[in-house]
């Protein structure tokens, strides 16, 4: 089965079923499975006729926010045998240029906001032949650098088209996506993932909890589709089950959009769950009725009120990328929302493990999904080792980067290749995995003891006065080993609420914050405790999916 084959299956069986819900000009609209497939075929015809891309040999790129055009252009190009490079629209020009050049991209589909960028960098992209622009008014006849065609997206649409799509139909073994990793340890690398990688990954994940997901479900899409988790857990998952997707308008409207769209499944990062949890708690504190009902023990009506604020239909909340605080998970479970934590990497399509709904093991990220193998390599005396993965979900390698590919795999001596995740973990007797940290983030002190920064961060983050924290190792003079340091940013809302609505002075906040960090660290073994605390002047730098960018702070505390 291919990714486009999933769409074709449901469009053939239930063409009128809604697939994509989105906001256009202030109104919510829905496209059915049948309408989506028709659009995919017509746009594929335009891509094929206009640019004549050679299937299975040439690559395309998409630089768009979540939208029906993102879905349509991806399916149109991959469905006809091309590989697509999804790119974060927020990347800087030089980052986009590097990816487009490295991936030898022939055609870029983007919007009017990024057309100026493309006109600047196109002359340094020898493989580029076309820029397709979604929205706005453009000069259809213009060329960039005298050779790169600029084409309006709608002008590609050929009514009744589909011959190109049919003639060059994708195969399961074709590369569907080349997804570039964040490049936190160097230049980004393009992970080559086949149609079959993604399909097998979701099949394995659905064996854990998918029997309860079906055509009546609606996936709320807030994470960008260029990210492997959102791409797989929202886009492919919905097509696999014949469900629908609804796009939130923006991060500012998430709460209202959830209320209006009434989704049943939300796939996001813990930060999203934490924000919703904070909003729930704040709402309860402000509601005199809710406070009264809770005081007299009537929790049920209060939980019903809260659930209706979330649309009334929410059944699953699935997170990945970082651990979620226990109070947040328990809050959603009281609302009868099954809160699942999972783990994965881009190179693994991306889901490796997920907690089954019926088993509650807070702190773990579940057992491996069906159809793959997971092992812990080079375990220490505590049973912690590097998580390695083998199976049909693992990438084919990094595009044009054989050295990085060779480094990413370990031969087991019998011809089997294990993907080295770089993550450290332990495993219990039931196969449930607990993430201990990143191998490269590990702090080793002068006694040779290992400190996992994530463990220290999770402890510090329990302090309500802390909004952001990153724990890193630092060196001091010529002393051997590393010491534990923390960079924190205050929760200004908490300080304001705790001070009668007035924000204390910066000096007062800094002093209290440092004191609170040390108090929380007293819960840890002495060798794990923070020795230096720096209060950041700005919120910590984060990735596009909300994870603190640890590499940006490496070395900043060294003395």
Enumerate the language-model features and the residues they cover.
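Conserved AMP-binding A3 loop
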Residues: 30-34, 176-202
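Conserved ATP-binding/catalytic segment of the ANL
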Residues: 375, 382-445, 453, 462, ...
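Conserved pre-ATP/AMP-binding loop-to-beta segment of ANL
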Residues: 15-18, 148-151, 158-180, 187, ...
């Amino acid at each position: 089965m291919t990714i486009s084959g999933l769409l074709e299956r449901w469009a053939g069986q239930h063409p009128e079923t809604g697939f994509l819900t989105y906001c256009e000009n202030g109104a919510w609209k829905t496209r059915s499975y049948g309408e989506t497939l028709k659009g995919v075929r017509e746009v594929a015809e335009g891509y094929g006729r206009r640019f004549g891309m050679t299937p299975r040999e040439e690559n395309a790129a998409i630089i768009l926010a979540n939208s029906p055009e993102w879905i349509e252009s991806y399916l149109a190009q991959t469905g006809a045998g091309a590989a697509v490079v999804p790119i974060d629209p927020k990347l800087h020009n030089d980052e986009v240029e590097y990816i487009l050049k490295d991936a030898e991209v022939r055609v870029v589909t983007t919007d009017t906001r990024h057309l100026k960028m493309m006109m600047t960098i196109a002359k340094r992209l020898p493989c580029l032949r076309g820029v397709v622009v979604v929205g706005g008014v453009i000069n259809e006849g213009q060329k960039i650098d005298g050779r790169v065609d600029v084409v309006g997206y709608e002008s590609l649409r050929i009514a009744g088209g589909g011959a190109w799509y049919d003639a060059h139909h994708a195969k399961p073994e074709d590369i569907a996506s080349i997804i570039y990793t964040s490049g936190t340890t160097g230049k980004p690398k393009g992970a080559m993932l086949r149609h079959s990688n993604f399909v097998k990954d979701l099949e394995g994940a659905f064996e854990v909890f998918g029997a309860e997901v079906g055509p009546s479900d609606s996936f709320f899409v807030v994470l960008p589709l260029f990210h492997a988790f959102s791409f797989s857990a929202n886009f492919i998952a919905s097509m696999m089950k014949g469900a629908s997707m609804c796009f939130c308008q923006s991060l500012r409207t998430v709460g209202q959009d959830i209320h209006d769209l009434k989704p049943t499944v939300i796939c996001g990062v813990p930060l999203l769950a934490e924000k919703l949890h904070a909003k729930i708690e704040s709402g309860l504190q402000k509601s005199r009725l809710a406070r009264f009902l809770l005081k007299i023990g009537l929790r049920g009506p209060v939980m019903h009120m809260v659930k209706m604020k979330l649309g009334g239909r929410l059944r699953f909340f699935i997170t990945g990328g970082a651990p979620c605080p226990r109070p947040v998970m328990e809050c959603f479970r009281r609302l009868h929302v099954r809160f699942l934590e999972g783990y994965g990497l881009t190179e693994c399509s991306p889901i490796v493990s997920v907690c089954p709904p019926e088993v509650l093991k807070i702190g773990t990220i579940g057992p491996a999904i069906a159809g793959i193998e997971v092992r812990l390599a080079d375990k220490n005396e505590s049973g912690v080792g590097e998580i390695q993965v083998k199976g049909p979900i693992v990438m084919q390698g990094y595009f044009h980067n054989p050295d990085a590919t060779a480094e990413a795999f370990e031969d087991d001596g019998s011809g089997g290749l294990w993907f080295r995740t770089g993550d450290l973990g332990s495993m219990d007797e039931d196969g449930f995995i607990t993430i201990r940290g990143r191998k490269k983030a590990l702090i080793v002190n002068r006694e040779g003891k290992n400190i996992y920064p994530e463990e220290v961060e999770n402890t510090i983050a329990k302090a309500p006065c802390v909004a952001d924290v990153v724990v890193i190792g630092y060196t001091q003079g010529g002393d051997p080993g590393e010491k534990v340091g923390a960079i924190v940013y205050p929760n200004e809302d908490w300080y304001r609420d705790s001070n009668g609505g007035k924000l204390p002075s910066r000096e007062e906040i800094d002093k209290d914050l440092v004191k609170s960090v040390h108090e929380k660290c007293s819960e840890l073994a002495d060798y794990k405790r923070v020795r230096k605390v720096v209060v950041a002047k700005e919120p910590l730098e984060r990735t596009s999916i909300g994870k603190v960018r640890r590499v940006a702070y490496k070395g900043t505390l060294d003395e």
